[in-house]
UniProtKB/Swiss-Prot annotation:
One of the GO biological process terms: prosthetic group biosynthetic process
Gene name as annotated: mdcB
Top-level class of the enzyme under EC nomenclature: transferase
Protein name: Probable 2-(5''-triphosphoribosyl)-3'-dephosphocoenzyme-A synthase
Superkingdom: Bacteria
EC number(s) on file: 2.4.2.52
Functional summary from the UniProt entry: Involved in the formation of 2-(5''-phosphoribosyl)-3'-dephosphocoenzyme-A, the prosthetic group of the acyl-carrier protein of the malonate decarboxylase.
Keywords noted in UniProt: ATP-binding, Nucleotide-binding, Transferase
An MF annotation (GO) of this entry: triphosphoribosyl-dephospho-CoA synthase activity
Database matches in Pfam families: CitG
Family, similarity comment: Belongs to the CitG/MdcB family.
PANTHER family linked: 2-(5''-TRIPHOSPHORIBOSYL)-3'-DEPHOSPHOCOENZYME-A SYNTHASE, TRIPHOSPHORIBOSYL-DEPHOSPHO-COA SYNTHASE
Reactions catalysed according to its record: 3'-dephospho-CoA + ATP = 2'-(5''-triphospho-alpha-D-ribosyl)-3'-dephospho-CoA + adenine
Species this chain originates from: Pseudomonas aeruginosa (strain ATCC 15692 / DSM 22644 / CIP 104116 / JCM 14847 / LMG 12228 / 1C / PRS 101 / PAO1)
């Protein structure tokens, strides 16, 4: 599946299908990006005993109907209010159930359903306004609304938020995804402009997010020690010239070894990288669905 090729070949394509394609492509591209420190990639399963690349790919594909339905619901409803928030919440829970059926109970993309689901809905609400900041701001307005049907959470992320006093995925969304919009995307663009290949530019974007994110996945697995190792190590790679430089590559290998030793996997940063890739592509492809509006 390649959303950009699909849009180029079929001008006037259905908006919901295009946005779902983009979201799934972003998840698969994030999973396949290598070498990511302590994360599932083409080399192996990172710090995860229960995950592998094929499972991540299958999980991403299973979420296509969820993203399509979220986009369709937002386009039909046409405004941000409690009713839309409730519909999106239920669609997200349905998508999570489909994911868990596909993975036989393994949580591969729960955080990504939240982040990308909000961004897909936000893009569908105003499909001619596709700049990253605009889409993230609309997503933040949706996230600020409570979903009365949502269960009171006792997930790893919720427990980490309470224990360490960090914001987590919910606050990141309510603040309009600042680590993606203000850190990940600018680094992606800087690395491209500096001559880095696309894979290295994406790695640098991931590292920029890791350098500033209070990643609840890392905190859950390795506490404050793990978080400091992630943030300091990511900054060291970028300061050494990024993943495209020899010195940066050496630092990246050191970071990978350190996080693996701590069993610390930056899953929250990975979700935000997928959000970056989705937002990065929106302006370039939005003309493909103009004829369907």
């Amino acid at each position: 599946m390649n959303a950009i090729a699909n849009l180029a070949a079929t001008p006037g394509a259905d908006l919901g299908e295009c946005l779902a394609d983009l979201a799934v492509d972003a998840l698969i591209d994030e999973a396949e990006l290598s070498p990511k420190p302590a994360l599932v990639d083409r080399r192996g399963n990172g710090a995860h005993a229960d995950l592998h690349l094929g499972l991540m790919q299958a999980s991403a594909l299973s979420l296509w109907p969820c993203f399509k339905e979220m986009a369709d619901a937002a386009q039909r409803h046409g405004r941000i209010d409690a009713r839309l928030r409730g519909v999106l919440g239920q669609l997200g829970r349905d998508g999570e159930a489909a994911m868990l059926r596909t993975t036989e109970g393994v949580n591969t993309h729960r955080g990504a359903i939240w982040a990308l689901g909000l961004l897909v809905a936000a893009a569908a609400l105003e499909p001619r306004r596709t700049q990253a900041g605009e889409v993230a701001a609309r997503a933040g307005r949706i996230a600020l609304l409570d979903d009365p049907a949502a269960a009171i959470g006792d997930s790893h992320g919720e427990r980490v938020r309470r224990r360490y006093g960090v914001g987590g995925a919910r606050e990141e969304a309510r603040l309009c995804f600042p680590r993606a919009v203000r850190h990940g995307l600018p680094q992606l663009w800087r690395s491209r402009e500096g001559g880095a290949g696309e894979q290295n530019a994406r790695l640098d974007a991931l590292l920029a997010i890791m350098s500033v994110l209070d990643d609840t996945c890392v905190l859950h697995r390795a506490g404050r020690v793990g978080l400091a190792a992630m943030q300091d190590g990511a900054r060291a790679v970028l300061a050494a010239g990024g993943s495209a430089s020899l010195a940066g590559r050496r630092r990246l290998c050191e970071l990978d070894r350190r996080l693996l030793a701590l069993n610390a996997s930056p899953g929250g940063a990975a979700d935000l990288l997928a959000a970056c890739l989705f937002l990065d592509r929106l302006p370039a492809v939005s003309g493909g669905w103009a004829g369907s509006l």
